[in-house]
Amino acid sequence: MHRRPITTLTALAAATMLVLSACGGSSGGSTTGKKSDNGPAVPKVDKLSSLGAGEGQLNLVNWAGYAEDGTNDKTVDWVHPFEKATGCKVNDKIGNTSDEMVTLMKSGQYDGVSASGDATLRLIYGGLVAPVNTDLVPNYKTVQDFLKNRPWNSVDGQMYGIPHGWGANLLMYNDKKVSPAPTSWSAVFDDASKYKGKVTAYDSPIYIADAALYLMRHKPDLKITNPYALDRTQLDAAVALLKAQRVNVGEYWSDYTKEVQAFESGNSVIGTTWQVIANLVTADKKAAVKAGVPEEGTTGWSDTWMIAAKAAHPNCMYKWMDWITSAKVNAQVAEWFGEAPSQSLACKETSDKTFCDVYHAADKDYSDKIFYWTTPTTHCLDGRGNVCTDYATWTQEWTAIKG
């Protein structure tokens, strides 16, 4: 994922909050993070047993927009108040992709990271992060329950981080150019030739899961039950679908501003998006777009603050995890960045009182339609044993797909 901070425009963009279908089935919303029997062992890393005084410093790896200190906008600053309250000086390093974040955490120079689900299991099983003692993070108690103990942020019922914010990957289309209104991801897969050269897709190996989700609904013979748990045959089918899609794709995007530009210029008329992108395009009034969750359901992301296994400043990191999930600050981050806050009390603190409705912040049913990004591992996430393909294999295949 490659994202940058934005000022939100939800009041102007309510029209984009279109659910394309009430269907979508179960996404595994009740699945916990417990590994299957005979699954890989998690490296033993002790969790903090008690909270002490801050060490005076905190070194973070984070997505742009997650540690704002007033530099980008003097009215947007939750870092300096944190420093004043705790005595922990924040030094943050922007990670542009999940792969870059994993590499930075391997350096041992950082106390914590705001990891997306396509990085979390790599960090956990790599022994790079520690389990979190949630009793030491008071604001965790009121984090949305549907974000706790999930496959991307916990193992064996043990949380390995504190949920920060989340969002769905939506299907967006120009409703002046695309007719009839699509209700299925088939519009960018089997029927994509109708919009040849105008289709856009997310540029990451994790996008293979979007193809797998589509096949899960339309090719039951493949027996896909989790789009992040693909054996070789299932992966080959997803790769074949994406290679067929490739000839119709005009642009792959990872920087959200590029997709905004593509839809506004007319270079793209249909493809995967985030709510914030739909909001921006709608607000700019350069293209008429609608976006929502198709009938198959969708993938999405939920970011997690994780503490390094060998954090030099663990007390400051725990203080940060509690601070960033406090109601007022979590609301600030969500509105600045353009995502649903994890904190259930944050919706009372947003400046735009329609914000949480637009982002479905408290909507468990909406969340349950989402297969959140989870790192593919050889040990199948659906419990089939060691027959699945891992993230490294997906990365190789993604390179081949793009050609």
Spans of model-derived segments:
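C-terminal motif of bacterial Sec signal peptides marking the signal peptidase cleavage site
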Residues: 17-22
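A ligand-binding cleft/hinge motif common to bilobed small-molecule-binding domains
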Residues: 119-122, 272-288
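Periplasmic-binding protein-like
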Residues: 141-142, 241-245, 275, 285-306
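Mature extracytoplasmic/periplasmic domains
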Residues: 303, 307-374
